[in-house]
């Protein structure tokens, strides 16, 4: 299995509900390493850049408004097949359809307040992490 990195962002609903520690603990228990971690309040411009692939879709404005409504916690995780592993751990976008045991299945309130975002491909990772981190903020091997 290839060692790779993925970008993860705990959305404002997850931060406000005090789920940050539990979510990070799940990733660490799965053997993923935190390579970068940051809490911030996204600007509209940053949110639009992060979700650029959804521009023009009916939900784009609501999504941007939601992720700029409170602080988020962004991180880069590294591990074997990290992108696939994290996507399986978080569950489908619609938390109502996410199975119990997944992050969204356990914590999402609806399709919008679904607690977490994660890259779905290497290309997404390369684009998304740059909204939050410069390369010199990513920790090397430890």
Swiss-Prot record:
It catalyses: a 2'-deoxyribonucleoside 5'-diphosphate + ATP = a 2'-deoxyribonucleoside 5'-triphosphate + ADP; a ribonucleoside 5'-diphosphate + ATP = a ribonucleoside 5'-triphosphate + ADP. ATP binds at residues 11, 59, 87, 93, 104, 114. The keyword Cytoplasm applies. One of its GO terms (molecular function) is ATP binding. SUPFAM superfamilies: Nucleoside diphosphate kinase, NDK. Its main location: cytoplasm. Disulfide bonds: none annotated. This is Nucleoside diphosphate kinase. The lineage of its organism: Archaea, Thermoproteota, Thermoprotei, Desulfurococcales, Pyrodictiaceae. The gene is ndk.
């Amino acid at each position: 299995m290839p060692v790779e990195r993925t970008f993860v962002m705990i959305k404002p609903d997850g931060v406000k509900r005090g789920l940050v520690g539990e979510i990070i603990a799940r990733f660490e228990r799965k053997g993923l390493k935190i390579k970068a971690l940051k809490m911030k309040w996204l600007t509209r411009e940053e949110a639009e850049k992060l979700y650029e692939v959804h521009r023009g879709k009916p939900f784009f404005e609501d999504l941007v408004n939601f992720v700029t409504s409170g602080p988020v916690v962004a991180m880069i995780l590294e591990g074997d097949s990290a992108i696939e592993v994290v996507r399986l751990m978080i569950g489908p976008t619609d938390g109502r359809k996410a199975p119990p045991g997944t992050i969204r299945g356990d914590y999402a309130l609806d399709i919008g307040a679904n607690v977490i975002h994660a890259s779905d491909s290497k290309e997404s990772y390369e684009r998304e992490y740059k909204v939050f981190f410069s390369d010199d903020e990513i920790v090397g091997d430890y």
